[in-house]
Amino acid sequence: MDIKRTVLWVIFFMSAVMLYDNWQRSHGRPSMFFPSATQTAPAAAGGASGTGATTTTAGEVPAAAAGTAPSTTAPAAQAQLVKFSTDVYDGEIDTRGGTLAKLTLKKQGDGKQPDLYITLFDHTAGHTYLARTGLLGGDFPNHNDVYTQVNAGPTSLTGDQNALKLSFESPVKGGVKVVKTYTFTRGSYVIGVDTKIDNVGTAPVTPTVYMELVRDNTAVETPMFSHTFLGPAVYTDAKHFQKIDFSDLDKNKANFEKAADNGWVAMVQHYFASAWIPQQGAKRDIYAEKIDPALYRVGVKQPVAAIAPGQSADVQARLFAGPEEERMLEGIAPGLELVKDYGWVTIIAKPLFWLLEKIHGFVGNWGWAIVLLTVLIKAVFFPLSAASYKSMARMKEITPRMQALRERFKSDPQKMNAALMELYKTEKVNPFGGCLPVVIQIPVFISLYWVLLASVEMRGAPWILWIHDLSQRDPFFILPVLMAVSMFVQTSLNPTPPDPVQAKMMKFMPIAFSVMFFFFPAGLVLYYVVNNVLSIAQQYYITRKLGGVKKKPA
């Protein structure tokens, strides 16, 4: 019995340690087991240096960050920030490059919790995250040039207006003029980006359009134990979802699909993502690289057919910038829902989230949905749990006889083991009989953990009374205390190990885990508390009502 219990505790403890180590690595802290790349300081607002008259050849994307004043001998044009507002965004477009330089997601606070508003794109001294485009293939307009707003009018989506269009015109460079138009649609996190290329020169031109996301490696919203993958990602039909670690870009060893005519590129962070989605069928090269200390970019380069003098070409793309809401992402582009990263348990986690979502649609509260899903999972696994608890009850029944044998043969381990094996055989007890049912449930346990950790729906979602945000820790630590109590009760239902050291360890484990759970999101702790309470009820029912424990005469 003590061997089985030790195995279970080791499995549980190692799972917790690995999860903790993953949290450490996911937001820049050193791993307990593996060396990590040195974390560099956040890039300054200006990003890499560059000049307004940068000449780029095919394949070279200028590295200067939008907002950096170009260094030229001639007076530089003055860039401006054009503010705009829709029902889902507040933002700013920098006329230097016509770059989307700031984007705040208004619906995350739902008008009632402004502290939950999330600024996705930003360009400050402490944080850089931009979406920008330009032309390659000659001395053509790029993100370092100052654009002019075209037909300046209302910059807010008002009344029954369904869409807001903002257009910006570049200066003529290399015989080319660019008109960039952003289209914001009511209720949508997808922004239309149209790049019109006019050949106003006297010779044909064959430019290449680049579309990229630029970001530093600074995580936002970083309470302990609540972050998943942070960094670039690429999706193609051939290689599917490919995450790119900043540390791999530091070492110039990132491995991902470099060319395609489908898919998208993205920057992913906890709960939110942005992605450039070029037109399906348009051939493009894909790149991801480090461009400055702690500043990175991922993007595509899409060639444009030759444009004759006096003619023009349009390159249309979509830019997603919003929350990782799985159902919404599925309708935007193939594979985009994968930015909501469940890791290696995706095959189990996705159906669990689907079920959680259905339950929420019925009860209207994510906290109660977690409770009901936990009850449902326990019901499904009841036969396995029953087998485990019956085995534990039988082991508990023969524990006094096991202790007597250990005492009798304590000087001869070989005879003691033989006597124990004979006892197991006579009583038809398998000392590991309770392990397998628990091991089978571990992937589901871990999957539900990642579902609750990765789901933006938990952000700002209340449960009852003092729990106002299931994605944050319990402000009064009530749930962690309840979890500690439930773990102690579970421990007391099991026989005391004969080894005093092991007995002390069994008493210490609930305290150790509870301290760690003090900093877990409330939604996760709620799941553990409900799971423990149901496990206690199951164990009591099975051992007391199904004859698992028999009274022995004194």
Swiss-Prot record:
One of its GO terms (cellular component) is plasma membrane. GO terms for biological process: protein insertion into membrane; protein transport. GO terms for molecular function: membrane insertase activity. InterPro entries: Membr_insert_YidC, Membr_insert_YidC_N, YidC/ALB3/OXA1/COX18, YidC/Oxa/ALB_C, YidC_ALB_C, YidC_periplasmic_sf. The keyword Signal does not apply. The keyword ATP-binding does not apply. The chain crosses the membrane at residues 7-24, 362-382, 436-456, 475-495, 510-530. Interacts with the Sec translocase complex via SecD. Specifically interacts with transmembrane segments of nascent integral membrane proteins during membrane integration. HAMAP family: YidC_type1 (MF_01810). This is Membrane protein insertase YidC. It comes from Burkholderia ambifaria (strain MC40-6). The gene is yidC.
